[in-house]
């Protein structure tokens, strides 16, 4: 599996990147200068949606902000209430219906660029929200690489 590198769309640490946090949610960044390709479709979660460098992005032109959207193939990291509290030990990949209600609520950190077909067929857990109830149900991740670290073919 290959994971796309973070782009300038996302901001992970408020103090490091100087971005703003809205209502204790995932940091957003100024939308200006992103090279945003807007989609014509209406969206119930943001005034506009589209892509920046292949990443699904939502934006609010009125507020001048943009954020990564929770779409199929996006990689997220669980966190506590503080927007910069994720340590990366709780990762997930969106493999079904896009949970857009998680936009700006749970941190997105990248996207799967190769291998999503293997992730999407893994059995779901039997616990609440599809979590695995027993450690033996979990599928180990044997390798994850940043796309930037993979030699060109």
Identify the meaning behind each predicted range.
Residues 1-153:
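Cross-family detector of peptidyl-prolyl cis-trans isomerase
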């Amino acid at each position: 599996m290959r994971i796309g590198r973070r782009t300038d769309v996302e901001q992970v640490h408020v103090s490091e990147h100087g971005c703003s946090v809205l209502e204790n949610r995932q940091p957003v960044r100024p939308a200006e200068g992103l090279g945003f390709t807007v989609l014509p479709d209406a969206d119930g979660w943001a005034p506009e949606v589209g892509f920046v460098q292949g990443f699904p992005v939502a934006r609010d032109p009125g507020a001048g902000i943009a954020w990564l959207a929770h779409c199929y193939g996006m990689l997220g990291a669980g966190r506590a209430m503080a927007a910069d509290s994720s340590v990366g030990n709780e990762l997930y990949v969106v493999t079904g219906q896009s949970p857009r209600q998680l936009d700006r609520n749970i941190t997105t950190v990248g996207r799967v660029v190769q291998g999503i077909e293997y992730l999407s067929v893994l059995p779901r857990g039997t616990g609440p929200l599809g979590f695995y109830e027993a450690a033996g149900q979990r599928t180990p991740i044997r390798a994850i690489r940043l796309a930037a670290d993979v030699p060109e073919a």
